[in-house]
């Protein structure tokens, strides 16, 4: 069973990103979309300018997996990272609405594989120990879900943030809430019936 990344580890990965390069600025914006919202990599790849409302601080899109609308507040740090990328690092090409592009000619939109590759590189370059832990884009989705569960955020809020259609879809995140589970261990039931007799068996009573 893979362990989730802690909030401290996620912060360490974010801090380790080299934002002095165009790729670093782009990847940092991608990383914040993952760590703050848990957006699926395919939806990040498909993100377009019409999905970003900088004036009203909103981000919205139709999820490719479910076909449902996903909409959230555009957090200040995410807004700043996106604007930094768009204004200073994104290639200036026409007739392309996709936000995230490759850094080399011919410029083209990133796909989900490229998103996952970029995330893997960022994690690998950080000092975070990823042994026995997920470390792709899905790892951040699992981490944000588990951290919300640990913080006792309602399942309805977790469901909306992750863009799940039903409450049942987040059950496996609740199973990952090891910290809280350890605080409420189940009591050992008192033995009864034949099981009780077996436990009280004495060798001297059964000698022939």
PLM features per residue range, with description:
Residues 66-83, 98-120:
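C-terminal catalytic core of Y-nucleophile DNA break-rejoin enzymes
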């Amino acid at each position: 069973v893979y362990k989730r990344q802690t909030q401290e580890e996620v912060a360490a990965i974010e801090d380790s990103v080299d934002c002095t390069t165009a790729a670093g600025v782009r990847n940092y914006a991608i990383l914040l979309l993952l760590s703050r919202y848990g957006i699926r990599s395919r939806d990040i790849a498909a993100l377009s300018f019409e999905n970003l409302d900088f004036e009203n601080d909103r981000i919205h899109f139709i999820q490719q997996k479910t076909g449902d609308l996903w909409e959230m507040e555009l957090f200040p740090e995410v807004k700043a990272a996106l604007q930094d990328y768009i204004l200073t690092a994104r290639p200036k090409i026409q007739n392309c609405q996709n936000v995230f592009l490759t850094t080399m000619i011919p410029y083209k939109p990133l796909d989900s594989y490229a998103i996952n590759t970029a995330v893997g590189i960022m994690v690998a370059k950080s000092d975070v120990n990823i042994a026995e832990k997920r470390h792709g884009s899905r790892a951040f989705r699992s981490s944000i879900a588990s951290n919300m569960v640990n913080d006792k955020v309602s399942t309805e809020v977790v469901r909306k943030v992750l863009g799940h259609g039903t409450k049942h879809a987040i059950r496996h995140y609740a199973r990952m809430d090891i910290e809280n589970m350890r605080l409420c261990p189940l009591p050992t039931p008192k033995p009864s019936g034949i099981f009780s007799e077996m436990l009280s068996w004495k060798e001297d009573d059964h000698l022939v």
